[in-house]
Swiss-Prot record:
Domain of life per record: Bacteria
One GO CC term, this protein: plasma membrane
Entry keywords, A to Z: Cell membrane, Membrane, Transmembrane, Transmembrane helix
Membrane topology qualifier: Single-pass membrane protein
Name of the protein this chain belongs to: Uncharacterized membrane protein YvlC
């Protein structure tokens, strides 16, 4: 079973989106575009807060080994 973690290989900022993409076996670039569109539609703050919270809650790939 896959574990959710922040990706070390597929990251731009903290690896949150890359980790989600690896967990669900999705394309990380597409997920990043969807995240940006969602952020624009919700005035950025909610998505930014969720992203920051996930940085602290979801362990990094390095911690999972």
């Amino acid at each position: 079973m896959n574990k959710l973690y922040r990706s070390e290989k597929n990251k731009k900022i903290a690896g949150v989106i890359g980790g989600l993409a690896e967990y669900f076996n999705w394309d990380a670039s597409l997920l990043r575009v969807i995240t940006v569109i969602l952020a624009i539609m919700t005035s950025v703050l909610p998505v930014l807060l969720i992203y920051i919270i996930w940085i602290f809650i979801v362990p990094s790939e390095r911690d999972m080994k």
